[in-house]
Amino acid sequence: MSKGRLFTSESVTEGHPDKICDAISDSVLDALLEQDPKSRVAVETLVTTGQVHVAGEVTTTAYADIPKIVRDRILDIGYDSSTKGFDGASCGVNVAIGAQSPDIAQGVDTAHETRVEGKADPLDLQGAGDQGLMFGYAIGDTPELMPLPIALAHRLARRLTEVRKNGVLDYLRPDGKTQVTIQYDGTTPVRLDTVVLSTQHADGIDLEGTLTPDIREKVVNTVLADLGHETLDTSDYRLLVNPTGKFVLGGPMGDAGLTGRKIIVDTYGGWARHGGGAFSGKDPSKVDRSAAYAMRWVAKNVVAAGLAERVEVQVAYAIGKAAPVGLFVETFGSETVDPAKIEKAIGEVFDLRPAAIVRDLDLLRPIYAPTAAYGHFGRTDIELPWEQTNKVDDLKSAI
């Protein structure tokens, strides 16, 4: 980036219609994994005015009361009254769940390496659940090694929900979005340019007299005070609150929502590339999810080891095969050692076969519902296995 370039990322709150769907899908997944860790799950959710539709494919020995899971999660998010446009206690819930395709199952249960090539390694038994490409990224912008724009957007979204739920701003409603524009000098963030914050609110709240000053003081300035970034000037940012002038009608009444429609919010805010696969509602046999988590784990450890200031890693799979068909490492000229050595070290330190990823990150657990909002990467409020920097010494030794 040349001097003076502006980069923008956005986040949304847990009450955004698409995020309601992600939360429901991952809550169903967790309920099944808790009883049967080997559950195969692909659950999609749609919400609209007064209705929730849950569909997909599941193979499991577990039982989940899906309508109850749906209602409990919606109520927890904060949609508990028709005055808010949606009520988890009274909305309609329709469930249409079938079994996983046996054609897919045979490739996952018995990989090409075992079925055709005759390999005996247990980690060659499980094939990838689909073809596809997944990216991981890390950068030294923040202590959690995430790009600053998305990290700040998530903090603002979490704070917006916090002041609603703890009663500090009790007139707020669950639906909301945040957007952060930061000025860069090269790759260094130097100035916070613009914050856009749209939040659903009770009727009759004055935008200029109440909402905007409350959001500036209780949300934005509180988050910025805790940010403590060394190079970022936050003294003269522009704040735009509800630029349409009013946001009373929100949630599923304002917009229909679908699982998997916030994949850039879920990852790196557009700063890094994305393979296209969504996460929520998918068990770890789906490499869309598990391999994207593994790539973040790889990238974070590379940066934490001091091998590069920023790195993007791509992996690719063929459905039904265990071994990746490709690995690509990009350090953007920020490396401290030969990138070819970094790529070789990654191959030696990390086993990227699906069964190995599941084993090393302990993914057959009900840990997914908390990831459904505020990002899957760089989380500081919950512990996630792919955020560990436990391979730093191994990478240094391999180099």
From Swiss-Prot:
Pathway annotation: Amino-acid biosynthesis; S-adenosyl-L-methionine biosynthesis; S-adenosyl-L-methionine from L-methionine: step 1/1
A Pfam entry, by short name: S-AdoMet_synt_C
Molecular functions per Gene Ontology: ATP binding; magnesium ion binding; methionine adenosyltransferase activity
Ranges where the record places region Flexible loop: 100-110
Example GO BP: S-adenosylmethionine biosynthetic process
Covalent link location (Isoglutamyl lysine isopeptide (Lys-Gln) (interchain with Q-Cter in protein Pup)): K341
Subcellular location: Cytoplasm
UniProt: Mg(2+) binding residues: D18
GO terms under cellular component: cytoplasm
Main location: cytoplasm
Keywords: ATP-binding, Cytoplasm, Isopeptide bond, Magnesium, Metal-binding, Nucleotide-binding, One-carbon metabolism, Potassium, Transferase, Ubl conjugation
Cofactor note: Binds 2 divalent ions per subunit.
Enzyme nomenclature, EC number: 2.5.1.6
Reactions listed under catalytic activity: L-methionine + ATP + H2O = S-adenosyl-L-methionine + phosphate + diphosphate
Entry function: Catalyzes the formation of S-adenosylmethionine (AdoMet) from methionine and ATP. The overall synthetic reaction is composed of two sequential steps, AdoMet formation and the subsequent tripolyphosphate hydrolysis which occurs prior to release of AdoMet from the enzyme.
Quaternary assembly: Homotetramer; dimer of dimers.
Cross-referenced PANTHER family: S-ADENOSYLMETHIONINE SYNTHETASE
Family statement: Belongs to the AdoMet synthase family.
Name of this chain's protein: S-adenosylmethionine synthase
Organism of provenance: Mycolicibacterium smegmatis (strain ATCC 700084 / mc(2)155)
Gene designation per UniProt: metK
